Curated annotation (Swiss-Prot):
Similarity annotation: Belongs to the CDR2 family.
Biological classification of the source: Eukaryota, Metazoa, Chordata, Craniata, Vertebrata
UniProt region (Disordered), positions on chain: 282-314, 382-417
Protein name per the record: Cerebellar degeneration-related protein 2-like
GO cellular component: cytoplasm
Transmembrane segments: none
GO molecular function, one term: identical protein binding
Amino acid sequence: MRRAAGMEDFSAEEEESWYDQQDLEQDLHLAAELGKTLLERNKELEGSLQQMYSTNEEQVQEIEYLTKQLDTLRHVNEQHAKVYEQLDLTARDLELTNHRLVLESKAAQQKIHGLTETIERLQAQVEELQAQVEQLRGLEQLRVLREKRERRRTIHTFPCLKELCTSPRCKDAFRLHSSSLELGPRPLEQENERLQTLVGALRSQVSQERQRKERAEREYTAVLQEYSELERQLCEMEACRLRVQELEAELLELQQMKQAKTYLLGPDDHLAEALLAPLTQAPEADDPQPGRGDDLGAQDGVSSPAASPGHVVRKSCSDTALNAIVAKDPASRHAGNLTLHANSVRKRGMSILREVDEQYHALLEKYEELLSKCRQHGAGVRHAGVQTSRPISRDSSWRDLRGGEEGQGEVKAGEKSLSQHVEAVDKRLEQSQPEYKALFKEIFSRIQKTKADINATKVKTHSSK
């Protein structure tokens, strides 16, 4: 009787399923909650990504505008630099010309001063010579009058001299003597005329020098005005250069902001970790049965990915996660072509979202397939138990032994077929599976490990009994 009672207990324990139906339903419920959370998070990320795209496009347009403006300012600056060089050369030429004109003006003034002194000295000499000429003329007239008086006196005193004076030979002698007296003052008059012509030439030369001096002074004032204008233009160019430097600084800041924004959509694994960080901990936050979740975690030991040191995940919003990524290594990025980079980032971000959506649908399909398999397997086990219990109801010991063997064989066959099916589905999904999708595979591996541990504990308990 004791043996029969032990066989009945053994057969009852062996007829139990290889898995706990409640644990399986809880795992499927967690998978469904995970899919729902993934879909909601996908929508949130899509909205934030679209907003980021719009902000990125605006910044790209602003940077392009500032780049064009900077190129224009650089071109203007180059033209201004060329103008500066030309103005410097012109200023140097004008300074040299001004210096030369100053030297010429000084030389002309010295020459004018010397010529003025020469003119004054010549005028004094001319006046002296004129006085001497007047004096000589007066002396000559006195001498002629004196000779005439003496001649008259001698004619009246000596009658014979009258004949001599009236003779043709004497007339010719008197004519020659008078002509010699008349030719005497001629060289002085010629010298006076020559000096007067020289004075006139010197006066004309002085007037020409004065005209040249006035022209040089006018040129000097024009050069000074042009130099002041060049200084004013130089001040304006300096202000333009400072403005160009300010615009370059603003452009550099915008480029740094652009690098930070483009780094958010980089192809590194940090982006996948940051995007999946809130999703991996969503079941923990939304678990409706915290007591059972803790028990399950205690059974798994290291069943959660957050418990491993290589997958440390913090629950945070997308902005803080992305800011953490940017703060991690902002200097390792460099800005390339902004427009092409923005387009590639947009395509890559949309591909990530599409892959997440596809993986979610694949997860739903896998969940439905597993659920249908489990239901079919449970229905088949119950149906087989009913069919085998009817013809062998007469011998209870045989029924218990046969039922235990068939139940264990069916459990093993169902587990083997389920694992094969899961492996086939995993292989099919791994063909286009990115790195961050390993999370889903790890979740199902944890579920299978939990089931295997439960079965092992059941086998151990049965064997111990």
